Amino acid sequence: MTTNPAGKSIVLGDPAPWFGAPLIGDGTFNLQVAAGRWIVLSFLGSPADPRADQELSNLLRDTQLFDEDKIIFCGIFTAPPQDATPYVAMSTPAISFLADYNGAISRSFGAAAMPRTVVLDPMLRAVADIAWDNAAGHAETVHNVLRSLPAVDDSAGVPLTAPALIVPRVFDFELCDFLTQVYDKIGGKDSGFLFDRDGNTSTLVDYRLKRRSDLSILVPEVRETIRGQIVRRLVPAIERFFQFSATRMDRYIVACYDSAIGGHFHRHRDNVNVGAQHRRFAVTINLNNDYDGCDLVFPEF
């Protein structure tokens, strides 16, 4: 996690401080999960301030600037609105409103004394910091910056490669076939995704965010076979390339993304939630050699 001394403006080029905040309405926004798009963080102060309403109207005058996969907008308030209904109505996958009622997020971006808009690149580094008192006009300057941004895939000027390790032949073919046959015979259940509420992590099924069926492997002998091949064939590669000694496995599952029902998993990080912060590496091993599904994408890269 990055930090920024309270009250100091963020330095352009530096990584932005990570944060999580409740959405006005329902749900939670985690900055670290939102990577992979240009992100507009507009610190608006109190919604009771008439200028906050005017600046917001000006910023959202051209909503076509914002797109869930390209540029997203977050309006951040330091006090609750008298009526949240208008903000809920304006909310879309590309436009959201965040509750920063203790002011901690605003302070970490230097927005406590002077409201401002900060633009982040897909790797969550600051590329623009436009205060309300900008001589060229706050909203107009923000719009000019957004119109000048390249496509997400061209944000670095050169192709980027995710720090993902690909290791062939981790499982024997016999183990792959066995696990596939067990799944075909028993089937899986909706796996859902982890969701934090009131400091607790629970599982929520929402087909817009994820659709996958999982079968937990519970037989000790099978788990030991899986673990043995991973420890001998994958763990040394992780230690060699990432200088990290993996000592535990979180769970043993056979997962299926079925194209017939639109299997998918929306953007996420595996260790954001309270109940998953022990995770360090996600391991996916393809079991079937006729797999021709979608790609695994790392939005930041």
Regions found by a protein language model. Give the residues of each.
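Short active-site neighborhood of thiol/selenol oxidoreductases, capturing the structured segment around
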Residues: F29-L60
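Residue-level structural signal for beta-strand termini and adjacent loop
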Residues: Q32-A34, A111, W132
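Conserved helix-turn-beta segment immediately C-terminal to the redox Cys motif
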Residues: R37, D53-G75, V88-A89
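Short, internal strand/loop/helix patches
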Residues: C74, V88-M114
